[in-house]
UniProtKB/Swiss-Prot annotation:
Main location: secreted
Protein's UniProt name: Disintegrin CTF-II
Keyword Disulfide bond carried by entry: yes
Domain of life: Eukaryota
Function: Inhibits fibrinogen interaction with platelet receptors, and inhibits aggregation induced by ADP, thrombin, collagen and platelet-activating factor. Acts by binding to the alpha-IIb/beta-3 (ITGA2B/ITGB3) on the platelet surface.
InterPro entries xrefs: Disintegrin_CS, Disintegrin_dom, Disintegrin_dom_sf
Species of provenance: Protobothrops flavoviridis (Habu)
Motif window: Cell attachment site: 54-56
Subunit record text: Monomer (disintegrin).
Segments forming domain Disintegrin: 1-75
Length: 75
C-alpha cells in the first residue's frame, strides 16, 4: 500500500480505527495505524521482536519510535 501525498495512513477499505477515513490522518492519540511495530494504534515497546531470526541472524526488534520493523543490520 502506498500512501498518497498528505496521507498519514491508508484510510480505505477495510476501516482502520487508528486512521480517520475522511482525512487519511491518524486519529487523535494514535502513533501509527499499521506495521509490524504497531499495536492498537501505538508503537510497540523498544526491543519487542517483530521478525523471528533466520539462520545466524538475530531477531529483528522494534525501536519504540516507529511502526517499521528494521532489519537487524539497519540498526
Amino acid at each position: 500500500e502506498l500512501l498518497e501525498e498528505g496521507e498519514d495512513c491508508y484510510c480505505h477499505i477495510p476501516p482502520n480505527p487508528c486512521c480517520d477515513p475522511a482525512t487519511c490522518k491518524l486519529t487523535p492519540g494514535s502513533q501509527c495505524a499499521e506495521g509490524l511495530c504497531c499495536d492498537q494504534c501505538r508503537f510497540k515497546k523498544k526491543g519487542t521482536i517483530c521478525r523471528i531470526a533466520r539462520g545466524d541472524f538475530p531477531d529483528d526488534r522494534c525501536t519504540g519510535l516507529s511502526d517499521d520493523c528494521p532489519r537487524w543490520n539497519d540498526l
